[in-house]
Each structure stands twice: as C-alpha cells, then as structure tokens.
Amino acid sequence: GGRLFIALNHAIGLLDHPNNGYINSTGVEDMLEKKGLKIRNDFIIDNNCGVCNFEQQYGYLKFQRSVSFPYCPVITNFSKHTITYGLRSMLLMFASSIEQIKTPTPYIFTPLAQSSSISGVQQAPVCFDLEKQWTQRDFNRPHNIVAALLTNDDNNSAIVTITDADFLINQSAIDGHTDNITFALNSIEWLADNSGLIQLRNKFTTFPVLEPVGDTSREVLKYINFLLPILIILGIAFYRYKRNLRKREDRSHPGYID
C-alpha cells in the first residue's frame, strides 16, 4: 500500500549550455512501468505554449526577444476528477508523454492532464532552435498525457505522476497566473483522503490562453520584431541629421543667434 505524489524531471533541457535536451532516467520510471504507467523518452511540443526570453545582438546593440517556445506547453485539457476540479491551465517546462501499458498488477490508470489538439513529441535527444519556424506538420501527435493517476483498490494505494518537477517553481506558478500549485495541492490532499476540502480551496484562477497563431502571422511578427528596432534607430538618426543640418543653415544667415 501507500500513496505517492511524483513530479519527475524525465526530460532535461539546457538552453544556456550546449543547447540540447536529454533524458534523465532516475529508476522511478521502472517502478511506475511495472504498475502500468510508462514515461516515454521524448519532449512534448505544443502550439499552445509559453514564451522564452533571450538576448540577441545586432552590431553594437543588444535586444531582448520573446519567442513562442513549444517545449513549454500550456495545459488546458483536464479529465473530470476531484484532483483536477476547477483547474483552468498549467504551464510546464520540458515534459515527457505518458502512456498506459498492460501489466499483471491490479492498478487502474487514469489520465489527468493532456496537451492540446495541436501538439506532438520529439524523440530525445533534442537540439533546441529558438529561430525555428514551426508549422502544423511539427505537431503531429495530439493529446499527449502529461499527468496521470494509478490506483489499486486491493491495498488502497495510489500514485499521482506529472512529468515536470519544476512546474511548482517556474515564474508563472510563482506569479499565480496558472493552476500549477493548485494541481499539486489537490493531488496531495486527495492522496491524504481529505477530498472534501478541495472544492472549498479551489480558486478558479484563470490563465489567459491565446488563440493559435498561423504561420503567416508568425512570419509577419518575426520581421516586425527584427526590423522595428532598426527602423526606430534610423528614424532617430535621420531626425538628428536634419536638425543639425538646419542649424548649420541657420548659422550661415547674418544676425543668427544660437
């Protein structure tokens, strides 16, 4: 018997290192697989995602850029369960997909949260490209499970698993913009069999989810993001050039006082 809440960093992403992603096997995966829950060696990608901020340099100028980052899926598909009651969204970072497999154990598998209808997976290892232009073809496997529940009525045991251990400490969770913390609290409370308090505590926090952006719109936004700072600088330079030119012309007139 026993009851567990497992948040597992199975997929590891290193953006500021050699820009790669790999699988970190801890041994917990083998235990879960024997009970009917398999964590795949992949990275979930989702068109409904968070953003990644990075610094880009144009000559002597440095700019902060924000780009959509499909490896940070925004999860809005939840099953009907006490644990997910009242949840609207969660933001994950480098999550792997979960699947149910047949085993001789009496554990019952229940999906709790899935990626969107425009999502997919990339097999590890992964090399991240922040400049990649994502298309519909990249999101070729929808509704990937990111959190699931295993229950065994014979010994009253249960295990809640989510494939991101950092979902409680990412900035979105800290700011309260998503239901990451609520999911963890609901899970622990349900596992402790205090489910009557869950409905009282749920806050129905809403995270605004943007509509999927088409390829054409992405391309337009990309060029606006690239060209706008340059055009502003050129505009300022042209304005100062014209102003200085006008001053020089005025100084050439008799009686001019600066």
Predicted regions and their residues:
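Intrinsically disordered or highly flexible coil/loop and linker segments, enriched in small
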Residues: 193-200, 233-236, 240, 248
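A glycine-rich phosphate-binding loop feature that marks nucleotide/adenosyl-phosphate handling sites
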Residues: 47-52, 203-206, 256
